[in-house]
Amino acid sequence: MTQVYNFSAGPAMLPVEVLRRAEQELRNWHGLGTSVMEISHRSKEFMQVAEESEKDLRDLLQIPANYKVLFCHGGARAQFAAVPLNLLGDRNSADYIDGGYWAHSAIKEAQKYCTPNVIDVTTHDNGLTGIQPMKQWKLSDNAAYVHYCPNETIDGVAINEQPDFGNKVVVADYSSSILSRPIDISRYGVIYAGAQKNIGPAGLTLVIVREDLLGKAHTALPSILDYKVLADNDSMFNTPPTFAWYLSGLVFKWLKEQGGLCEMEKRNQAKAELLYGAIDRTGFYRNQVAITNRSWMNVPFQMADASLDKLFLREAEAQGLQALKGHRVAGGMRASIYNAMPIEGVKALTDFMADFERRHG
């Protein structure tokens, strides 16, 4: 059987070691004679899963004690509404950094609840999209918080700087880059991330929130999105997505076994450099993002002759290189190379790209 590598932007590839373990214990989890999917979320066995997964995540990200970790439903789109309704308080404005598709989607949702101060930080020089340095962002004085998306999956644009905005509350959508490298949690008020890219399977959403921000929710906010309600109930206000939570916990253990986030940073940089090197080598392929803002997680690329796209994708699929079609908004190709993608998968892709260019260039 051909080795398959899944380059999907999400739901994305999971570590093979995690899948093997889940397969082994699927029908008889911890000797109970049932699957983890079938046991009560309030059972002592699942409570152990919840406690261990939070501890492992705190260890990986070095989450300070004054932050709550919430395991939620709804994906990042639910958080687009939850953030303003939890954090605005008596204010009517927040700073929203517009750096791409997902940042703009958060802005559109926030407009239902407040008047966002939209700050476009994109640059366009010589056909390349980039992001202004954070020191140039024109933040307002009266904003309840500053919201931005560090990694745009569709455009392949990354903001690699860590925020340093004094006492401003910083909110970040880390859905596509969480756990890919170390970050300083103390610089943020809220971090949220859909699980289906770099954490685990779809259905789980991670929220990390500083404790002093709890208890300010709008009265019309549904309880299931209220950070304080979720924190007070240890993410068990209603039945959580238990299987996704369990699998994410296995991913956290796998990450620790691999050497933690410093090791993942090295691996992710090596994978990205290999792929961008193949794209830049001759001009047959091209990436339209400024080098300083190229994403390590999502690498879009095009060919000068777009008529070859369908052939490229068909031949790649036949070689076991799956889900390389670009987002419908951007077209072209896109390789998502999250933590679970081994460098062997990127090498297989770059070898195929070189061979395709040799035959069609």
Curated annotation (Swiss-Prot):
GO terms for molecular function: O-phospho-L-serine:2-oxoglutarate aminotransferase activity; pyridoxal phosphate binding. The keyword Ribosomal protein does not apply. Catalyzes the reversible conversion of 3-phosphohydroxypyruvate to phosphoserine and of 3-hydroxy-2-oxo-4-phosphonooxybutanoate to phosphohydroxythreonine. Keywords: Amino-acid biosynthesis, Aminotransferase, Cytoplasm, Pyridoxal phosphate, Pyridoxine biosynthesis, Serine biosynthesis, Transferase. Binds 1 pyridoxal phosphate per subunit. Its cofactor is pyridoxal 5'-phosphate. The modification N6-(pyridoxal phosphate)lysine is found at K197. L-glutamate binds at R42. Gene3D superfamilies: Aspartate Aminotransferase, domain 1, Type I PLP-dependent aspartate aminotransferase-like (Major domain). Its EC number is 2.6.1.52. It catalyses: O-phospho-L-serine + 2-oxoglutarate = 3-phosphooxypyruvate + L-glutamate; 4-(phosphooxy)-L-threonine + 2-oxoglutarate = (R)-3-hydroxy-2-oxo-4-phosphooxybutanoate + L-glutamate. GO terms for cellular component: cytoplasm. GO terms for biological process: L-serine biosynthetic process; pyridoxine biosynthetic process. Pyridoxal 5'-phosphate binds at A76, R77, W102, T153, D173, Q196, N238, T239. Transmembrane segments: none annotated. It comes from the Bacteria. Its main location: cytoplasm. The keyword Ion transport does not apply. This is Phosphoserine aminotransferase. Pathway: Amino-acid biosynthesis; L-serine biosynthesis; L-serine from 3-phospho-D-glycerate: step 2/3; Cofactor biosynthesis; pyridoxine 5'-phosphate biosynthesis; pyridoxine 5'-phosphate from D-erythrose 4-phosphate: step 3/5.
